[in-house]
Amino acid sequence: MVRLAAELLLLLGLLLLTLHITVLRSSPLQHGNDTVSLEQDSRVAENNVNADSSSSVQLGPGDRQTRVAHIPASQPWAQSPGTGGSLQRDGPGAFLLDLQNFPDLSKADINGQNPNIQVTIEVVDSLEGSEPEKGMRKENKPGWAAPNWRNWWQRSSSSSSSSVSTPKGPEEQDYPYESNTEDSNFLKPLGDWERRVKSEAGAGSRTQTEYDYIDGEGDWSAWSPCSVSCGNGNQKRTRSCGYACTATESRTCDMPSCPGIEDAFKTAATEVSLLAGTEEFNATELFGVDTDSCERWMNCKSEFLKKYMSKVATDLPSCPCFYPTEVAYSTADVHDANTKRNFRWKDASGPKEKLEIYKPTARYCIRSMLTLESTTLAAQHCCYDDSMKLITRGKGAGTPNLISTEFSADLHYKVDILPWIICKGDWSRYNHARPPNNGQKCAENPQDEDYYKQFEEAREF
């Protein structure tokens, strides 16, 4: 009997102890402690969000940014999509009830010390710009080859293009890409797809000038019109040779003779015919080149020849001491100090001149051109060595042409070339009758030793 009473008392004590433990678990003190713990956790999470916000990239007005953060589920707070950016705290009871509505969290064990739960929170300033920014978030660093890198540059650059139209508000700014010279970077010209993107983006804007920079040398342009309408002139053409570089090429152009030039030479031609005693100018009879004797040609002292040679000496310019390089590209004016006039010269070094035969030591030659002021049909002929110095004597020296090639190439051959052939290339006898010009008193070229050597060779030949 006593034993039965003891067992009953022990069972009653266990029931009281169980009841006491149940009452303690459901007491308000426990809820208060949980609330304090949750508030402390929420403050820590809020500080973390502020730290992340301060370290994020600052964007201008109208820009959107998506923030992604991972936090433990023991921090009972969340950002509502409709709110501007302030954090909302819920009571612990409401949080526990709402937690059951999430399929992924309904079976989570929240009684553990560190529950393995991750919550994704998106901080969105505006719903308008969420889609474009998702495309930018796919890359960790800017890719310069991506089609939309220019849009990113336009937003991040502090200096925007002047072609952007009326400024918009922060929420309606769409940043269309337009540009002037910044668009055509010579280091990376626009590709075809970039041109299409630009034309679509700026369909409603004004037309922009596109510059195509050529890497290296481009195609030559068409030749420009001749600089003169009659006579001898020049024309040019250009091409691009890179950034801020233009190559220019020029050439001579021969137009029909200017009106009046035939009249200017008519008197001289008539005088030649009259003095020769024939109706036509016969060079072979005048200079006696129809014979095989070089002496007869050298001793021809007709009155016409004396008068003509006197006019040639005063009418023609003196040879420049150095080859005028501008003549190599086109005709050029060179000032003559003796006559105090400008004379027009052209190059005479081409293959048809046959310098290796008639002027064997010459590298360059020039010939004066006829003008309306000319009183004869003659032209000055000057030749230069490899160092562009005037050859004043010897077998390479130039001699005056009594008939210019401009007037008649056939007469020039009969009067100026054929006598040299009749003399069998003996330049010493030819130059005696047609002395080379050195009116500007240039230094003797070649030197005495070379000159005498050439003279002896001519005599022996």
UniProtKB/Swiss-Prot annotation:
Disulfide-linked positions: C226-C253, C230-C258, C241-C245
Keywords: Disulfide bond, Glycoprotein, Secreted, Signal
SMART domains: AMOP, TSP1
Bias (Low complexity) ranges: 156-165
Main location, first listed in the record: secreted
InterPro entries with a match to the protein in the record: AMOP_dom, Angio_Inhib/Adhesion_GPCR, TSP1_rpt, TSP1_rpt_sf
PROSITE patterns: AMOP, TSP1
Domain AMOP, first and last residues per copy: 286-449
Ranges of compositional bias, category Polar residues: 40-58
Family annotation (Pfam families): AMOP, TSP_1
Secretion signal, residue range per the UniProt entry: 1-26
Compositional bias annotation for Basic and acidic residues: 131-141
Cited PANTHER family: ISTHMIN-1 (PTHR10239:SF30), ISTHMIN-2 (PTHR10239)
Protein name per UniProt: Isthmin-1
